[in-house]
Amino acid sequence: MCWHLTVPTAAELDRARELFEQHEPRDLFYRVARDLLERTLAGQSDFTLTEAVAVVLLTWNRRFYIRKDTPAFDAQHVADIDDLLDRHGDALAAYRERSIASLRDDDEPVVESLFDDFDRVLGPVGAAKALHVLAPRFFALWDRPIAEGAGVYLGKRGTNAHLYWRWMLRTRAECLDLGGEAEWGVGLLKRIDELNYCSFTIKVM
């Protein structure tokens, strides 16, 4: 299994941002979800955390919900997401205050357990997107083409937690090599995902 992708350069990240904005209008929904989530957490919105996360899931992960072997986005699915957020609320609140640079070996059991629970409900791509929007400085993003670009092949729901932990370690190394948030600000994980998305998902780089 290959886990190496060349560490991106500043020029590549900047070019990816330009291409991403040209080719991906759905970024609007990411920004809306982030804003809605922050206002919900601050008690400034009538929407719930689940509804804020749903903005991302129903736009960036919509293919998950049209497959025959995955759940519909119905009342039961919303209740399942509510349950995830309730059960893992304390852990998510703690991770929301951290950056991926702070990732430690002793985070592994909690991160893997958290991801496994989300994976079983949302699939491996939806799990990463939901966790990222809930703690955007800490949880790394991926999709299947991006993972496959690194030689990583995602499995069925509930089988990907260790792969995601390894992805977190790999992304932390990338962030540190790039200079971290001190160089790029708090949106560095999103910038890396934009480069991966342009390179492996829509292949415009």
Which residue stretches match the model-derived regions?
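An N-terminal alpha-helical hairpin/helix-loop-helix interaction module that forms a charged
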Residues: 1-118, 136-205
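Short hydrophobic alpha-helical segments that form membrane-spanning helices or hydrophobic packing faces
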Residues: 127-133
